[in-house]
Amino acid sequence: MVAQPLRRFDTLTDEERAFLCTFPDDTERSPWMVGKDFHRLAIEVLYYPLRRYRADWYVSSDLPILYPRPNNRLGQVAPDILVALVHNHLRDAFDVRVERGFPPFVLEVVSDESRPRDTGKTKKVRIYDLLGAQEYVIFDPRAKRRPSLSGYRRTAAGSWEEWPLDQQGKLQSAVLGLTLAQEDMLLRVEDAAGHRLPTIDEETEELDTLRAELARLRGERS
């Protein structure tokens, strides 16, 4: 799951180059970057299990990804979750020139403010295609009818296609080797055996239970 090389500018059409040059950056002042409590909770439920799952993964949230534009300026996108197999150290930004490619897995938790940008085929769907993502997950917990899970993925031939849910309504990630499953208005991660990866709250609760049981056993022996 190494960073994916960017497409060479000379392989792009004039329209694609123009799109890369003019796509608005994700910045702290962008109205679609405003996070509300529920939006942050949905991200936290994903971030901690993914970061704990493998020590050789680099997992981050809302980190700027810097990429070169055809006009020699830098562009910036900041997915809610990114995963890449690069050196796991703290970063101020994920610079694709330094990392030699784009993160293969990106995920957006949609908010009311970000919905047009995150789901639009002429916006985030397209920029992640042109930048070389292998998988893009879109989770919309507050869609009009019900929570919505969808995505796009890279085929073996290199094309960018809609990512179908399996028969259980889940996404099987080839990049992560994990399954993404809706649970009410949250998105959870499952391993190959179907076991849900615990959140930090669940791990803390389990640890507290074990400590209480240990204290009880010690009390019975005294």
Each PLM stretch: what is its role?
Residues 1-135, 139-222:
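Gly/Pro/Ser/Thr-rich low-complexity, intrinsically disordered segments predominantly at protein N-termini
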